């Protein structure tokens, strides 16, 4: 794995309750990193929590147990025909009929068989490799700052893509494959809500490697906490002052 060359310490200034997590997809086994405890039986999304709680970075491999659809999405296992037909989602009450569950599978991002054999995880403070995806768990206020760091110098639109199940595909795989920053509300994803992945007011933001340098630099440059966000009175005063000043200045362009 390529050693970390970026200074990502600016993210610490946002005081996240849980540290950002760097994720790396690997064909070959990561060196100088311990495997995930063989006794663990976690879902792919729960490996975020495991990263927060573990003492050191670790990697997950196809020899490890996985309690949900992670191995299927990573191309390590095939989906059972009864599951692929949509039977599970109907029985969970998520979909009216199996057909609706089946139809949405075509939209879920996944890796081809045999491409990914290992996935490395590290909390930001112990990150030593260049991550493929940096995953942030944020409050709504923190999420506003992180997402603004994307559009600050680029004008890029905010976009959120997910599905009611297989939400882990949209925080791990979709950003990596598409090169787009994605954010989701865990409470809107069946498994994440049921497994109590994060606090009720959380937003998960996934930053692919393409965007990490841009957003890091923008966080360093921009004003994180805007005066207008202090309250309605401050917002109206600042906005009104700017409009008045521009109206006056525009008389003599």
Regions inferred by a protein language model and the residue ranges of each:
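Acidic, serine/proline-rich low-complexity intrinsically disordered regions
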Residues: 3-253
């Amino acid at each position: 794995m390529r050693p970390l060359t970026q200074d990502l310490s600016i993210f610490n200034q946002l005081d996240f309750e849980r540290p950002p997590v760097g994720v790396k997809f690997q064909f070959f086994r990561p060196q100088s990193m311990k495997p995930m405890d063989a006794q663990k039986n976690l879902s792919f999304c729960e490996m975020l929590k495991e990263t927060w709680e573990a003492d050191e970075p670790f990697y997950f491999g196809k020899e490890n147990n996985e309690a949900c659809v992670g191995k299927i999405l990573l191309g390590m296992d095939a989906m059972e025909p009864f599951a692929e037909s949509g039977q599970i989602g109907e029985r969970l009450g998520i979909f009216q009929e199996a057909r609706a569950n089946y139809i949405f599978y075509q939209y879920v991002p996944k890796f081809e068989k045999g491409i990914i054999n290992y996935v490395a995880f590290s909390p930001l403070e112990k990150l030593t490799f260049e991550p493929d995806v940096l995953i942030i768990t944020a409050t709504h206020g923190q999420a506003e700052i992180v997402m603004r760091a994307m559009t600050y110098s680029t004008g890029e639109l905010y976009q959120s893509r997910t599905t009611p199940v297989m939400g882990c595909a949209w925080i791990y795989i979709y950003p990596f494959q598409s090169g787009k920053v994605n954010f989701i509300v865990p409470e809107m994803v069946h498994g994440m809500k049921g497994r109590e992945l994060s606090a009720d007011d959380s937003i998960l933001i996934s930053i692919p490697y393409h965007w990490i340098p841009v957003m890091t630099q923008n966080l360093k440059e921009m004003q994180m906490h805007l005066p207008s966000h202090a309250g309605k009175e401050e917002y109206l005063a600042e906005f009104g002052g700017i409009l008045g000043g521009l109206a006056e200045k525009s008389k003599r362009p």
